[in-house]
Structures are given as structure tokens and as C-alpha cells.
From Swiss-Prot:
This is Protein E8^E2C. Residues 72-82 have a biased composition (Basic and acidic residues). GO terms for molecular function: DNA binding; DNA-binding transcription factor activity. Plays a role in limiting the replication of viral DNA in keratinocytes. Recruits the host NCoR/SMRT complex to viral replication foci to mediate repression of both viral replication and transcription. Its main location: host cell.
Length: 175
């Protein structure tokens, strides 16, 4: 008889109604039969938590540096093969680069082959291409290598044999 004293639970055809206080209550249709269970509690319906707004100080915005960026740098690009002679760099944070251009699969193989010369460059990009440029062919990819100095770049170009199907462009990049 102790089992019969358990609280009743509604049948599987029970309906869920939301009261104006924001709690969910179970209601039973008139033609359903009750089942025994102890889960007749009201379930609170609360909205999911919102993300907190980020708080920034008035001095610094997101993704900004504490040092102001200025154009007081008097360094100029001075590469003999560069067509933009005397171009002023806006930041002292530039690094020498080489763009290798060619068929994407050839560039991928070249990038794998130069892994034994890791000490002669800093970073190598994946194969990429310019989008939305009229007059370019689809089979023209680019791999970019960065160097710590112009001397390191020159040592790389002297040491590594570059296939004739790959063209290269020297330059600098702001990082």
C-alpha cells in the first residue's frame, strides 16, 4: 500500500502550459489516465544567459596597441629589383619577403622541398591567389616566404635552386 501513496504523474499525453509567472506546469487532458511518479514539480522557464558586454578602458580600444602608430620612420625600401623605389614605409615593423608565383601544385611541391632549408627563412605561406583580379589565369598561385633580414633572404636565393616554371618577386611586408 505504500506504493499507492506516491504522488501521481500524468500520462504520456500530458500537455505543457506556461503560466504568466514564467514557470512550466504540467496539465492533463480530460480523457487521460494518471501514472505514478514523483515528477509533478513546476519547471522554471528562464531565458538563456546573455553574453556580457566587453569592458574597455577609455584609453584603449580592442585590437589596438598601447604604442601609437606614427609615420616618423624615415626608412625607405632600397631594393634594386623593386619598381617602387623610395616608397616610404609607414611602420618600422617590416620584413623582407619573396613571392613565388606559378602553378599551384608546383608551388606545393617546392614548399615541401625547401623544408630542409628551414634555417634560411622564417615562415612559408600556403598556396594562395588574388581574387577578383581581371586578366589573371586560374592556375596561377603564390607562395610567400618571410625572412628575418635581407642577408638571410639573399643567402636563401643563393643556396636554393628555384625551378624555371616558378617566377619570384622580392619585396617587404609590414607585420
Amino acid at each position: 500500500m505504500a506504493i499507492l501513496t506516491w504522488k501521481l504523474r500524468w500520462s504520456t499525453e500530458e500537455a505543457l502550459s506556461i503560466s504568466s509567472t514564467g514557470t512550466a506546469e504540467h496539465t492533463r487532458p480530460a480523457n487521460s489516465t494518471p501514472r505514478t511518479d514523483n515528477s509533478t514539480k513546476a519547471i522554471p522557464c528562464t531565458p538563456p544567459p546573455r553574453k556580457r558586454a566587453r569592458v574597455y578602458s577609455t584609453d584603449q580600444q580592442p585590437h589596438s596597441t598601447s604604442d601609437p602608430v606614427g609615420c616618423d620612420n624615415d626608412r625607405h625600401i632600397s631594393d634594386d629589383n623593386n619598381k617602387n623605389q623610395g616608397r616610404h614605409t609607414s611602420s618600422g615593423d617590416t620584413t623582407p619577403i619573396v613571392h613565388f608565383k606559378g602553378e599551384p601544385n608546383t608551388l606545393k611541391c617546392f614548399r615541401q622541398r625547401i623544408q630542409k632549408y628551414k634555417h634560411l627563412f622564417e615562415q612559408a605561406s600556403s598556396t594562395w591567389h588574388w581574387a577578383c583580379v581581371p586578366g589573371t589565369t586560374k592556375n596561377r598561385g603564390i607562395v610567400t616566404l618571410t625572412y628575418s633580414s635581407v642577408e638571410q633572404r639573399q643567402q636563401f636565393l643563393v643556396t636554393v635552386r628555384i625551378p624555371p616554371s616558378i617566377s619570384m618577386s622580392l619585396g617587404v611586408m609590414s607585420l
